[in-house]
């Protein structure tokens, strides 16, 4: 019941901002939809591992939404209600030429990082069979951040062609090739998140550059991603019995395309509840800065930055 109520609330909050702005990717509308909708999904309690959240957890979730909602409203009014991003303003600050070099350069760097990881580690995840955690093992400290930076290229490609592209067919063809390489890398890494992020970011960029975009574009993108998501899950040597067993799903026959995303979403909220109950003190944001400590190498210089207890729920 609580899950259904939160789904309705998420839909209403998104529709409220969409009707007012006419913007499919209205920032507050999207945040409200995914934040509250994610809680609704977690409240379905499809797994035996899930428990009721503490009152403090509910208060934190509510304050996060209210704080974002009010802050956005205040800033939106101060800025004249012009939340919509338009490409006209962007075109005044940029040209096709620098975008071309950025796309090609980032593709080369990302591909080189991927090849380096594959050479040093001795395998490519998508080619490995029977090893469910091949993706987790395909990781070199610091370098992997460079490898996955390819997820920015599809969105940059959208910007490139939105500005007219190049008069040279070869240059345009090279950009398309770069976009294909950027999609291929997450597939070779069997990284579902990176693939989904790359596609969704490109779709959002396209929507931001157009005045009128059909909501069906999002539906088509999601439908197109589902088979890719399932295939990558299979390539990871994850079958539905394995996943439903690990996540202790109440219904052992739950389809894999429901189990996988559901647990990713639900676990975020359940993990937060676990930390609310177990953490003796607030980390003051230090845990959230782990990517900085890893990329900069500071975690090796000062291990205390990442020396936090691991809680299992």
What do these predicted regions represent?
Residues 1-177, 212-215:
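Membrane-anchoring hydrophobic segments
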Residues 39-51, 189-193, 197, 302-313:
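Membrane-water interface signatures at transmembrane helix termini and the short loops
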Residues 61, 167-252:
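Hydrophobic alpha-helical segments of polytopic membrane proteins
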Residues 68-78, 212-219, 238-244, 286-296:
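Short, highly charged low-complexity linear segments
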Residues 130-139, 228-313:
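Small-residue-enriched transmembrane helix-hairpin modules in multi-pass membrane proteins
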């Amino acid at each position: 019941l609580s899950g259904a109520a939160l789904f309705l609330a998420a839909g209403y909050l998104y529709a409220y901002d969409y009707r007012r702005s006419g913007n499919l990717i209205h920032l507050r509308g999207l945040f409200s939809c995914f934040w509250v909708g994610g809680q609704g999904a977690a409240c379905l309690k499809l797994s035996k591992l899930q428990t009721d959240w503490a009152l403090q957890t509910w208060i934190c979730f509510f304050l996060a939404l209210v704080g974002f909602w009010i802050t956005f409203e205040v800033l939106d009014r101060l800025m004249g209600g012009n939340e919509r991003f338009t490409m006209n303003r962007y075109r005044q600050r940029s040209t096709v030429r620098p975008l071309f070099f950025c796309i090609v350069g980032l593709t080369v760097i990302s591909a080189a990082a991927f090849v380096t990881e594959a050479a040093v580690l001795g395998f490519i995840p998508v080619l490995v069979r029977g090893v469910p955690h091949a993706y987790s093992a395909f990781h070199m400290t610091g370098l992997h951040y460079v490898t996955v930076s390819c997820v920015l290229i599809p969105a940059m490609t959208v910007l490139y062609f939105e500005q007219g592209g190049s008069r040279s067919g070869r240059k345009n063809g090279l950009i398309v090739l770069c976009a294909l390489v950027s999609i291929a890398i997450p597939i070779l890494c069997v990284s579902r998140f990176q693939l989904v992020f790359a596609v969704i970011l490109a779709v959002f960029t396209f929507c931001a550059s157009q005045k009128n975009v059909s909501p069906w574009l999002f539906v088509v993108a999601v439908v197109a991603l589902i088979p890719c998501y399932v295939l990558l899950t299979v390539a990871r040597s994850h079958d539905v019995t394995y996943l439903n067993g690990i996540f202790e799903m109440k219904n052992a026959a739950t389809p894999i395309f429901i189990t996988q995303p559901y647990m990713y979403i639900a676990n975020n909220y359940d993990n937060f509840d676990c930390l609310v109950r177990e953490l003796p003190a607030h980390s003051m944001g230090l845990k959230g800065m782990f990517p900085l400590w890893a990329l900069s190498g500071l975690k090796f210089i000062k291990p205390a930055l990442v020396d936090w207890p691991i809680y299992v729920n």
